[in-house]
Regions:
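Conserved switch/coupling elements of ABC/ABC-like ATPase nucleotide-binding domains
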Residues: 220-226
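Short, low-complexity, intrinsically disordered N-terminal peptides in bacterial proteins
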Residues: 1-2, 227
Length: 227
């Protein structure tokens, strides 16, 4: 099977005053095309830092992060921006929606860096994206008019409208109640299967991790794969 990610000896070191903190420590990992891997671990043990490295939001202090053979740490800022805009979709715990934009406008904003086709085509794509997450009737609503679960559905539509190869999700259900959590994870699993996405999902929730094909645990910056 084709490898989408290959990480070799990846470390990330930050300075905290007079001391250094190794948030990610010598991680080796491969992720196959179309695979779903869940990363678990306690707060502050490097999960989100690892996801930032996978998404090109940060560069490793040492080691290599290859995405489809391209070394993300060696790409220019402009090249990384292009990769993030086309190949990777991001979903965050706090939704990261623009409060003054409607659901449809928040989703459409993801197409702006791509200079996607005309307004009519963008609107059609936005409508299809919102329909795919069950929010066709909420297109004109502001985030403040939506529940937490609905806001996360908008965020999922925004991540997927670019038709990325990779979906990176950082605690996507952390702000949701148990029932809504189950609905959002079921939706993500459905979209993952339908679209053949490569999904890396960070969560402290064991119930979510059990749905993934593989699970890894981060502890003090070290990654251990579980069967």
């Amino acid at each position: 099977m084709t490898q989408v990610y290959e990480l070799t000896g990846v470390s990330k070191v930050y300075r905290a005053g007079a001391r250094t903190v190794e948030a990610v420590a010598g991680v080796d990992l491969t992720v196959d095309d179309g695979e779903w891997i869940a990363v678990r671990g306690r707060t502050g043990h490097g999960k989100s830092t690892l996801l930032n490295l996978l998404g090109g939001l940060d560069r490793p202090s040492s080691g290599r992060v290859l995405l489809d053979g391209a070394d993300l740490g060696r790409l220019s800022d402009a090249e990384l921006t292009r990769v993030r805009a086309t190949a990777i979709g991001f979903i965050f715990q706090t939704f990261n929606l623009v409060p003054t934009l409607s659901a449809a406008e928040n989703v459409e904003a993801a197409l702006i860096p791509l200079r996607a086709a005309g307004a009519a085509q963008r609107r059609r794509r936005v409508a299809a994206a919102l329909d795919s997450v069950g929010l066709a009737d909420r297109a004109g609503h502001l985030p403040s008019e939506l529940s937490g679960g609905q806001q996360q559905r908008v965020a999922i539509a925004r991540a997927l409208i670019k038709e990325p190869k990779v979906l990176l999700a950082d605690e996507p259900t952390g702000n949701l109640d148990e029932e809504t959590r189950d609905e959002i994870i079921a939706l993500m699993e459905k979209l993952w299967r339908e679209r053949g996405l490569t999904l890396v999902l960070v969560s402290h929730d064991a119930a979510i991790a059990r749905r993934a094909q593989r699970t890894a645990v981060m502890s003090r910056g070290h990654l251990t794969l579980r069967s």
